[in-house]
Amino acid sequence: MLAFLNQVRKPTLDLPLDVRRKMWFKPFMQSYLVVFIGYLTMYLIRKNFNIAQNDMISTYGLSMTELGMIGLGFSITYGVGKTLVSYYADGKNTKQFLPFMLILSAICMLGFSASMGAGSTSLFLMIAFYALSGFFQSTGGSCSYSTITKWTPRRKRGTFLGFWNISHNLGGAGAAGVALFGANYLFDGHVIGMFIFPSIIALIVGFIGLRFGSDSPESYGLGKAEELFGEEISEEDKETEENEMTKWQIFVEYVLKNKVIWLLCFSNIFLYVVRIGIDQWSTVYAFQELKLSKEVAIQGFTLFEVGALVGTLLWGWLSDLANGRRALVACVALALIIATLGVYQHASNQYVYLASLFALGFLVFGPQLLIGVAAVGFVPKKAIGAADGIKGTFAYLIGDSFAKLGLGMIADGTPVFGLTGWAGTFAALDAAAIGCICLMAMVAVMEERKIRREKKIQQVNIA
């Protein structure tokens, strides 16, 4: 029934290497565009919820705590799915898996729309459909990473993955425009248009994506990327292959027993409190506390994503200039985040609000990218998916969930850790950023030792 998700591996064509290399580009670009556009579209049917919050409050009388409960459902299933669904997808045709999951997620969001009537809602159905949507979206990043890794040479993989990484920034930045167009032009200003229109787009993108590309050049008889581009298999990968380690053995040895991965997991928890805390509540804070218009509030949300796009491209490059010191560069960004949060909290006018959100997007997505890049440096290629999965699971189950429900309760006036109101919300954001700095500083020390150790080995080999 789901045979289209199985991997296809054809015998290598009896053609010269340079001919097969020329044949590589077209199917690669098809596959690359499918995962890029597919992941971008996932954000259109995820971030529209953030855009619609003020209208859901005014139309249906939902409280911030209830909105937080809906978001919590997504966070839990997304977090669990990051490990479970990604583990299942490993060994499947990941290029096909992503658009299939996009289609299922879009169907769930249509169900979410149906749970909102003319003037009433079913909170249970809203939580259920949004949670299912999160479960299906959870493997989007892992499938994209797996597909691109199988297609590209190591020396250019960072460029391709770095550019792919802006897909979710573009999706987040475009979510407001797509959602508002659906509501204002297709549904006479009703909030359900913010969910139905993006879902229809996602269905179209998903079905088209199933028709183009595949997860590896081996699907076309072109051979492995290493063979096509004259690269040796890395030492870490050779070790796992020579020992014939199973996926579970690799997961235990290189992830569960890896203290750096655990430090990065907890760093990611704190970072997600900051990132999702800003992302989830910026429009509500601007409208309720700063007394700005809904239009300006949404502009700030969009600028946060635009700043993230720029930051995603720049911070990785800066860490390369620092000779791979990802954690150290992340600490610099985190220190700047704390200072900028103060400006955002006390924004005196809309221009300060907009500028501070752009700056926060630029800064927050630097450490998010660098935590992932740092993790890659401490595991073999076969463990990257597992490391990314467990890191994401912790971030969403704890960090994302607290940012949505915990911060929502604090803003509503419910004491959490002795914090109440918007002042308490910002105190929690500051504390999370400080916690992330402390953990990343520990990673920076271990990263420095690794860099110096590898440098000595390289000097010995040259001598």
UniProtKB/Swiss-Prot annotation:
Kindly state a single biological-process term from the GO annotations of this entry: glucose-6-phosphate transport
Q: Which family does it belong to?
A: Belongs to the major facilitator superfamily. Organophosphate:Pi antiporter (OPA) (TC 2.A.1.4) family.
Q: What induces it?
A: External glucose-6-phosphate induces the expression of the UHP-region.
In Pfam terms, one family for this protein is MFS_1
Listed GO molecular functions?
glucose 6-phosphate:phosphate antiporter activity
Q: Where in the cell is it found?
A: Cell inner membrane
**Bilayer-crossing regions:** 25-45, 61-81, 97-117, 123-143, 160-180, 190-210, 260-280, 298-318, 327-347, 358-378, 383-403, 426-446
Q: How does it sit in the membrane?
A: Multi-pass membrane protein
Indicate where this protein is primarily found. membrane
SUPFAM superfamilies from the UniProt entry: MFS general substrate transporter
- InterPro entries annotated for this entry? MFS (IPR011701), MFS_dom (IPR020846), MFS_trans_sf (IPR036259), OPA_Antiporter (IPR051337), Sugar-P_transporter_CS (IPR021159), Sugar_P_transporter (IPR000849)
This chain's protein is named Hexose-6-phosphate:phosphate antiporter
**NCBIfam families per the record?**
2A0104 (TIGR00881), PRK09556.1 (NF007107)
Tell me the function of this protein: Mediates the exchange of external hexose 6-phosphate and internal inorganic phosphate.
**Gene Ontology terms: cellular component:** plasma membrane
Q: Which residues lie on this side of the membrane: Periplasmic?
A: 46-60, 118-122, 181-189, 281-297, 348-357, 404-425
* Cytoplasmic membrane side: 1-24, 82-96, 144-159, 211-259, 319-326, 379-382, 447-463
